[in-house]
Amino acid sequence: MTDSYQMEDIKNSNETSISLQNVTISYGDSDAVRNVYFDIPKYKVTSLIGPSGCGKSTVLRSLNRMNDLISSCTLKGLILFEGLDLYSDQIDPVEVRRKIGMVFQQPNPFPKSIYENIAFGARINGFSGNLDELVEDSLRKAAVWDECKDKLNESGYSLSGGQQQRLCIARTIAIKPDVILMDEPCSALDPISTIKIEETIHELKKNFTIVIVTHNMQQALRVSDKTAFFNAAEKGGTDDGKVGYLVEFDKTKKIFNSPKEKATQDYISGKFG
């Protein structure tokens, strides 16, 4: 990344964190999702919902360039973060992923101690402060400090599934991102662990912008401020596959209580999906 594009120097005073402008994402010659427009607000939770195959996870991964790891994946259009083109040739994808962190569907702690799960990433990113304080602060923000404080030197694998997922959230927090992406973070967890994660999300939005993919309609309603509903349609022509598209984006309560589109109403009422 060149000096003129240092992401930590980019601060936009408006209320938008990330803006997608006519985004089409393809794998090879096949479009996965087309013509997506919406703005992700700062310090809010935005949910991406829709049936399997509608492109919501593909869109989520595009927000921090995780799709770059798939050689056949290409993107057209613009994704702006604080007004900066994330796909500019002058932007370092590694720096993008530091500013826009990701929590995956399955808990994936490092094969290290609980302490090192937090400290390792901060250390390799040049953190020069008090690591003990950083570890405690990150674990507290992820609501897992009480479960971890007496066994910081034990393996991250010693924790339960829900605790491991909150450890992964703490690990992401420790890098000091601006945005946290979550790809179905509760799908592998029991109901009690899910409640803990949702409570954590409510607390995290005080300091972070959060984007979450979920198949759980009630979860989207509980945790998010804005919701984007995606659907999939037949591509037509010689291609018998489907392509995802954004149907509707609005305040979550409006999406669930008075959606503009019939497809949205049908999906949230369980008629398909």
Swiss-Prot record:
EC identifiers of the protein: 7.3.2.1
Keywords, sorted A to Z: ATP-binding, Cell inner membrane, Cell membrane, Membrane, Nucleotide-binding, Phosphate transport, Translocase, Transport
Chain positions recorded as ATP binding sites: 50-57
SMART domains linked to this entry: AAA
InterPro entries: AAA+_ATPase (IPR003593), ABC_transporter-like_ATP-bd (IPR003439), ABC_transporter-like_CS (IPR017871), P-loop_NTPase (IPR027417), PstB-like (IPR005670)
Reactions it catalyzes: phosphate(out) + ATP + H2O = ADP + 2 phosphate(in) + H(+)
Any one GO molecular function term: ATP hydrolysis activity
Domain spans labelled ABC transporter: 18-257
Record bears the keyword Acyltransferase: no
Cited SUPFAM superfamilies: P-loop containing nucleoside triphosphate hydrolases
Source organism, top-level taxon: Bacteria
Localization terms from the record: Cell inner membrane
Chief localization: membrane
GO CC term (a single one): plasma membrane
CDD domains on file: ABC_PstB_phosphate_transporter (cd03260)
Membrane topology: Peripheral membrane protein
GO BP annotation list: phosphate ion transmembrane transport
One Pfam family here: ABC_tran
Described purpose of this protein according to its UniProt entry: Part of the ABC transporter complex PstSACB involved in phosphate import. Responsible for energy coupling to the transport system.
Family: Belongs to the ABC transporter superfamily. Phosphate importer (TC 3.A.1.7) family.
The protein, known as: Phosphate import ATP-binding protein PstB
Lineage: Bacteria, Bacillati, Cyanobacteriota, Cyanophyceae, Synechococcales
